[in-house]
Every structure is written in structure tokens, then in C-alpha cells.
């Protein structure tokens, strides 16, 4: 049986994605997802592979296509007791 996950920490961030515009146009949105994973992993002390991107955040990143992700996103992050983190778009 699996244990129930408990929220250990809950935070809000504004993550700048301007570094995604340094890479070639055809890789920007995918690179922006990686930027968010690395940012959250660094701030919450989890592995980048343990960071889950919410569906609404993913839709926002890809809304203008692969070539033009947003310059910044406001997110809410929850860290769970099992060492994972969930990143959702702040509304």
C-alpha cells in the first residue's frame, strides 16, 4: 500500500524564462520546461526528475507555439513528503 502524500512546503514564484530565448527558435518551449524544472529543483531541494509540471502551466508554455514561450510565469509550487514537487500556474 502507498502512503498518503502530505504537503511539506507551499510557495509562489515568478519564474523568468528569458534565458529560453537564447536557444534556437525551434527548441524554446521545451527549454522553458527544463528551466522551470531546474528552478523548482534548486529552490525546493528535490531532483529535477521529481518535479511535475501541471497541465495548465504546460498549456500556457506552449500556447503560442514552440518558438514563443512567455517571458515569465507566475506559479505555485507544492513539495510533498515523498520528495516530489508539483508546479501549477498561479491564477
Swiss-Prot record:
Tree of life domain: Archaea
GO terms assigned for molecular function: structural constituent of ribosome
Entry annotated with the keyword RNA-binding: no
GO biological process: cytoplasmic translation
Gene Ontology CC terms, in alphabetical order: cytosolic large ribosomal subunit
Keywords: Ribonucleoprotein, Ribosomal protein
Any Pfam family matching the protein: Ribosomal_L31e
UniProt keyword tRNA processing present: no
UniProt xrefs under CDD domains: Ribosomal_L31e (cd00463)
The family this protein is said to belong to: Belongs to the eukaryotic ribosomal protein eL31 family.
Protein name, entry field: Large ribosomal subunit protein eL31
Lineage: Archaea, Thermoproteota, Thermoprotei, Thermoproteales, Thermoproteaceae
Gene that encodes it: rpl31e
